[in-house]
Structure formats: C-alpha cells, structure tokens
Amino acid sequence: MAKKKKLTKGQVRRVRSNQQKRLKKQEESIQWDENMLGASKQGLVITRFGQHADIEDLETGEVQRCNLRRGIESLVSGDRVLWREGLESMAGISGVVEAVEPRTSMLTRPDYYDGLKPVAANIDQMVIVSSVLPELSLNIIDRYLVAAETLNIAPLLVLNKVDLLEVDDRAMYEEWLKEYERIGYKVLFVSKNSGEGISDLEVQLRDRINIFVGQSGVGKSSLVNALMPELEQEVEEGAISENSGLGQHTTTAARLYHIPTGGDLIDSPGVREFGLWHLEAEEVTKAFVEFRPYLGGCKFRDCKHNDDPGCILREAVEKGEVSEVRFENYHRILESMMENKANRQYSRNKKADL
C-alpha cells in the first residue's frame, strides 16, 4: 500500500477554510423575515460559537441563542448588543443580533496569520491568575501587566493553590510578589481547596466585569467553580499532566458568568504565552509603571535602557529603586517581541507564496 502523503500547512489551512465556508453557508440558510421578529432589545453576549452567540436579555435575564447579521464579525463575550427575538425558534436559533453597542475596552490576542483577534469586551478588571503548580512565572505576570496597562484595564494579581505551600516556601512567594504590591498592584493568595482568599477575591470582583487570564493549569476554572459552586459540572477543571507538569487546555471558548456575590466574570481559554509583538517598544516601556518617573531623563533621547551611557533607569536598578527582576523581564519581553515579529513576517511571506 502506498504511503499516504502528508498535507502541507497551506493545504491544511485551505481545507479548514473550505470547511468554515460550508458551515457558514449552512448557518445562513436560516433566514428570518421581518414579520417573524419582535421589537429590538438590549442584550449581553454570554459566549459566541462561530456565526451564533448566546445572548442574555437584559430585561428578563433569559439566554437565547441567536444568529449574527452580516457584517458583525468581532462579537465577543461582554459585548452589549441590540437584538430581536424570533416569534418562534428555528433549528434551535431564537433570534438575531443586529448591532453592537460602543465598547469601553477590548481585550485582544495577537494571531500570526490574522493579526489581532478579539477575546472579550467592556472589561473593567484583568484577574491575572498564577499558581505554585506547574510553577510561578514572573515573566508571564509581567506580560499580562503590560497588556493590562496598555489597554487601561485595572489588573489584579492572584496566586492560586497556595494550600500546596510549606511555611518556608510561602515566605519565598510572598517576597517575590511583594514587589508588585510596592509598585501599586493588589495581590491575593487564594486556594479553592482550603478556601483561603476566596472571600477577598469575591470583594474585588464586585461591580466589575472581570476576565481571568493565565497559563493553562493555573486553576482558572477551579476558581470559577469556587466562586460559583453550582457550575461545578459545567466548567471542566484542567488536569496537570503527570509526565510534563504542564496544564491541559480545558475551557474552549470565552464565556461570561454572573457571580452570585456580585460582578461578572469572563473565563477565557488558557494560553502558554501572551503575545505582545503587536505593541511598540515605547508602549511596553510605559507599561512598566515604576519606570515612568525616569522616562525622558536619560542622556540620549533614543536610550534603549540597556548599556547606554547616561541611562538613569539602569542607575535606578543599580540603586535598588527599580526591581532588577522586572527590569530583566522588560528586556526579555522586548527581545521576544522582535523574534515574534520576525517569525510573523516570515509566516506571512510563506503564506503568500503558497
């Protein structure tokens, strides 16, 4: 038997594109006449599935699955919309989303091929979840903080699974995270198993639309279950691979939940690394809040804050006024941005050649 030829990446993308077109054509076969639709209402996007979205009626609280009008592309959890309910359900679809209201904020995630992909809208607070298992990464925390600062979304740092820490280890983690408190960020130590910090977390989430971000395996879904026990069966908890120690991807689509104690929560898919290549270096520099008092004071206007002579930011690091760890992470982020931009350009050129 002849060996089956493996598809190239370009062929795989074309197959997926054709599948999406067929699915979209099938979905568009569900058409609504004007006389089959009720009056326009305000709604809240709970989650989205392709050309469908689950919309909460802001008057009744009921959730209906709706089609999207042509031209509505970037609908995401947290969006406020205008929608019309069908007088009867058609193939499980109960209405149509007709317009998206202006957003106060938009969280996006870079994609190599498609540029920026929206993740969630109208976010008030970014809950950056880390964990003692698989391991705490201050570099990942700093990446999320850059995203939060550039989007003007208030960040909240949460260290999960602290029940696994011995006393000496806990003191070490507290020392690591004390720097973030020093520069003005709120830090919480929490555990679903012991209940530590859960009530404090509930207080911080009230009256806000919150999004949980963090690597896979840090326990975002387990915290959702701790905040809303009735969803224990609905939200699948991630397992840690015994072989690699890495978390398995669990949540497959961003979804908004109402927290019984107040506030809303959007649970988003975990990511291994939060891409920042779409930002300019100056934006990243300003996103490190403790750098701001020193910016503009270096000897040279184009100072890279590395080995440049007369760099007052590096002098501040040497004096202990700025964290050396944060300063090193800053340069790592800039280096990875340059690498990712180069890889993206290579991918785009390769895609154009296919």
Swiss-Prot record:
Q: What residue spans carry the region label Disordered?
A: 1-28
Query: Quick one: which residues bind GTP?
Result: 160-163, 214-222
The family classification in the record reads:
Belongs to the TRAFAC class YlqF/YawG GTPase family. RsgA subfamily.
Q: Does the keyword Nucleotide-binding apply?
A: yes
How is its cofactor bound, per UniProt? Binds 1 zinc ion per subunit.
| Organism (species) | Vibrio parahaemolyticus serotype O3:K6 (strain RIMD 2210633)
Q: What is its EC number?
A: 3.6.1.-
Q: InterPro entries per the record?
A: G_CP_dom, NA-bd_OB-fold, P-loop_NTPase, Ribosome_biogen_GTPase_RsgA, RsgA_GTPase_dom
- Pfam families in the record, alphabetically? RsgA_GTPase
Q: What is this protein called?
A: Small ribosomal subunit biogenesis GTPase RsgA 1
What is the purpose of this protein?
Answer: One of several proteins that assist in the late maturation steps of the functional core of the 30S ribosomal subunit. Helps release RbfA from mature subunits. May play a role in the assembly of ribosomal proteins into the subunit. Circularly permuted GTPase that catalyzes slow GTP hydrolysis, GTPase activity is stimulated by the 30S ribosomal subunit.
Spans through the membrane? none
Q: Where does Zn(2+) bind?
A: 298, 303, 305, 311
Domain CP-type G residues, every copy: 113-274
Q: Which gene encodes it?
A: rsgA1
